[in-house]
Amino acid sequence: MGNALAVYRDTFPPSPTYSVNDVPDLTGKIIIVTGGNTGLGKETIKVLLQHNATVYLAARSPSKAKAAIDELRDMTGKEALFLQLDLSDLKSIKESARQFLEKEKKLDVLLNNAGVMMSPIEQLTKDGYDLQFGTNVLGHFYFTKLLLPLLLSTAKTTGEARVVTLSSGAGLMVDEIDFNTLKDSPARKKLGTTKLYMQSKLGNMVFSLELARRYADQGIISTSINPGTLKSDLARYVDSLIYKLILKIISYPVPMGTLSPLYAATYPDGKSLNGKYLKPWAREGELSKTATDPELGKELWTWMEEQVAPFESNAS
């Protein structure tokens, strides 16, 4: 009940005290934003470009990315850089990281923004995982893992590197990660697409906090984010007219959703944000007992390591 009340309150947050005008000058900073071709990702990139960051727009579709980059150039006069990334394909993720590592010698911020919400139950990743968990959690884990050596070397040089992972208040609404539902199975179909989405958002929280535990002493700052309920295309798979109407009523403009991720990515006292969960609008929130369970953190991390291990050899 407490989690449900917290989610309800966070759906109607107070007016923000933080704004995009508080973002510092980001000259010299290199940032990746996954899912940057649309919605919250694109709006976040716009602000980062306006504050002089070098930004890689990571997305699956070259044509959609190009259209977004052109639009961002028109709005900001700055050029985002395209990085092809399909988070539902582990082999593609490895290639994307390889391409980035060939181009850059540092990475200040990895903003794990991309996500899938309530996709049709029959949809799986290329490797056979539930599309929502496979994309939202496992895909971002593998991308982060591959870039971690560069993040660590950046932190050694500059004092810090940040990983900002988008979650949702929905992650507070479930009390476990059922590992039997992460690949196609009768248990997965029984759980249903809504709870699978909630479970993936819990997974984002658990991953982000476990990353903070493991690498805080090496300068990594890991934060999870509830950006708020936004008027974006994330809910494109929702087929309930009533639910769509409710979302329309309670949703906020997309630019509002940039406040928490921008705060986590650029707030000068970044170390104070390590392991934290930010809710709308750039306020510190409280994670559930499940999300903060260190045993679940270890279990999820170990499971994800096992899933990506076959792709770690040079032959893959």
Curated annotation (Swiss-Prot):
Domain of life: Eukaryota
InterPro entries on file: NAD(P)-bd_dom_sf (IPR036291), SDR_fam (IPR002347)
Pfam family, any one: adh_short
Residues at the catalytic site: S167 (proton donor), Y197 (proton acceptor), K201 (lowers pka of active site tyr)
UniProt enzyme class: oxidoreductase
Keywords: NADP, Oxidoreductase
SUPFAM superfamilies: NAD(P)-binding Rossmann-fold domains (SSF51735)
Binding residue positions for NADP(+): L40, K64, D86, N113, K145, Y197, K201
MF GO annotations: oxidoreductase activity
Enzyme Commission code: 1.1.1.-
PANTHER family from the UniProt entry: PHOSPHATIDYLINOSITOL-GLYCAN BIOSYNTHESIS CLASS F PROTEIN (PTHR43157:SF31), PHOSPHATIDYLINOSITOL-GLYCAN BIOSYNTHESIS CLASS F PROTEIN-RELATED (PTHR43157)
Known role: Short-chain dehydrogenase/reductase; part of the gene cluster that mediates the biosynthesis of erinacines, cyathane-xylosides that show unique biological activities, including leishmanicidal activity, stimulating activity for nerve growth-factor synthesis, and agonistic activity toward the kappa opioid receptor. The role of eriB within the pathway has still to be determined.
Similarity section: Belongs to the short-chain dehydrogenases/reductases (SDR) family.
Protein's UniProt name: Short-chain dehydrogenase/reductase eriB
The organism of origin for this protein: Hericium erinaceus (Lion's mane mushroom)
Protein's gene: eriB
